């Protein structure tokens, strides 16, 4: 649903994004920034800025961003709070906000250059915000067009092929640790990253893969166990954690036994991490910080022509948005 009576985007109010990514921050810092942005929801209440403000929170393994149509002082206050962590967030407004999200959705701003997962992550963040709030026309327009053009950009071959991906890196790490392909692998959470890793490992010959989720998944071809039946005493050689909510969804007594199997390896794909850092065995635990370091070693440079072409598309949509808002103002004034 689109908000009525939306305020014009201008000098006082910006369509903007504030956030951090793998470039500026460690995983721990991104977790802290995510907490700040989640707590900032109170800043969007009417008693703070005289009217309700809408926003979209995008949180992935490698970035945490908040998009909103809001006064400059709101973005400034968030930036100041984030800077207290020793982090310098980026802030893009209006046409630069458009250009940024278009490049994100197109995979050109990803650590895994050209990855496709980010398209789904952006879409889910947008749809969740649309379910929970009455989003402004500007935010609807921004996300719908970024998702559309990201898809078109890939279809035309603009996005580079991602030669090194997280599933490939996980496969390489299992080989390095000499994990047998008959070893029992457990994936907790039916997240996109868990699915992509599981199906890749299955294609590589790993034959004993189990998924654990809230309920049975009728279309899943792999073994399944529901959360109520999960037991870390079972001989899972490798455990993959695909959701940050697992830390609170599973009982503490269960987590205490996750390291009981000698030499068990745990991959924690969640942001925030599913396992607190003080509870892990470092030589048996891999989180997104380590994976990010591996990806940086293999990252390709962005093709400047691809970047320029996608930004130009974004700028055209920004101009189109302003024209639409002006027409709405004229209709409202003449009503």
Curated annotation (Swiss-Prot):
Specify the pathway: Porphyrin-containing compound metabolism; protoporphyrin-IX biosynthesis; 5-aminolevulinate from L-glutamyl-tRNA(Glu): step 1/2
Give the positions of the site Important for activity. 100
The record's listing under InterPro entries reads: 4pyrrol_synth_GluRdtase, 4pyrrol_synth_GluRdtase_N, GluRdtase_CS, GluRdtase_N_sf
Q: Identify the SUPFAM superfamilies for this entry.
A: Glutamyl tRNA-reductase catalytic, N-terminal domain
Keywords linked to the UniProt accession: NADP, Oxidoreductase, Porphyrin biosynthesis
Which positions are catalytic residues?
Answer: 61 (nucleophile)
Example of a GO MF term? NADP binding
Disulphide-bridged cysteine pairs: none
EC number, UniProt record: 1.2.1.70
Q: Name one GO biological process term.
A: protoporphyrinogen IX biosynthetic process
* Family of this protein: Belongs to the glutamyl-tRNA reductase family.
Entry function: Catalyzes the NADPH-dependent reduction of glutamyl-tRNA(Glu) to glutamate 1-semialdehyde (GSA).
About its domains, the entry says: Possesses an unusual extended V-shaped dimeric structure with each monomer consisting of three distinct domains arranged along a curved 'spinal' alpha-helix. The N-terminal catalytic domain specifically recognizes the glutamate moiety of the substrate. The second domain is the NADPH-binding domain, and the third C-terminal domain is responsible for dimerization.
Subunit and interaction comment: Homodimer.
Designated name of the protein: Glutamyl-tRNA reductase
What species is given as this protein's source?
Chlamydia trachomatis serovar D (strain ATCC VR-885 / DSM 19411 / UW-3/Cx)
Taxonomy-wise, where does this protein's organism fall, top ranks first? Bacteria, Pseudomonadati, Chlamydiota, Chlamydiia, Chlamydiales
